[in-house]
Amino acid sequence: MSVYSNKALTVLGLGDMGSALTRSWLAAGYAVTVWNRSPRRAPTGATVAATAATAVATNTLVVVCLLDDAAVRATLDGIDLTGRDIVNLTTSTLAEARALSEWITARGGRFLDGGIMAVPSMIGVADSGAYVFYSGATELHEANAEALAVPAGVNYVGADPGFAALYDIALLSAMWGMFAGAAHAFALIGKEDISPMAFAPLMVAYQQAMAGYAYGTAAQLARGDYTEGVESNLAMMVTTNGTLLRTAAEQGVSAELLTPFMALMERRVAEGGGKESTTGVVDLLRR
């Protein structure tokens, strides 16, 4: 029997994130039906369905949080999705999300994709900073706004079903770059009498001070002029590459996290972009 209620939903997938999502809805008073390949992972209070098909049939709102796009398709394949609101919180690419939207729609369902900007411990925690990008069917988003706001903040980025995935991966990519820089920095100080615990606050403060550069990059991309307002141009920055590389060599640290970006900087200068900021590198990546 299907439940048409804004206080009931189904969750497919009970990994760390799926379990955290489920617990947040249970704590908010929702009736949650769950399915997982290992039913023993079900949080206390959830109703465990024997099959994915049974779980989907139970509620109109179905949240999917599985390993990848292939797992989503394998789980939903052959299940009647007529009248179902499928909210996919599985990490995917823009193209995968768009294709999955068509796949779900062709089977009678409505589709909303999501990109979770949080780790499981942040889910359901007030003021944790957690939020989810959503994109896809506007009416689905509006109809389920209350339920979707329970685990984390909501940022709806448009009707294109691929946009949530793109925002998600773009920000994760920026984070990967930050992690790479931090790894290199900690490696540099590793041989010296410098406490990582004392160094960490300096790194955080410096990264925060530099983070605003993104606004300048965005403005330059919008204008198409990469030289306006530049204080340290690309040619000047490239001259420091040698110092960074020599320091790494002296400290016995591999520079493999730095050299790909340095190569792009040098290439842009060689092509005449020496007076630009690092924004010019964006064009090289888009070619």
Predicted regions and their residues:
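A generic structural signal for well-ordered alpha-helical segments
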Residues: 25, 104, 148-149, 189, ...
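Helical "substrate-binding/catalytic lid" subdomain
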Residues: 164-260, 264-285
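Hydrophobic beta-strand scaffold residues
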Residues: 32, 48, 110-112, 196, ...
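NAD(P)+-binding Rossmann beta1-loop-alpha1 motif at the extreme N-terminus of oxidoreductases
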Residues: 1-61, 84-85, 120
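Rossmann-fold NAD(P) dinucleotide-binding segment
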Residues: 52-110
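Rossmann-fold dinucleotide-binding core
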Residues: 92-173
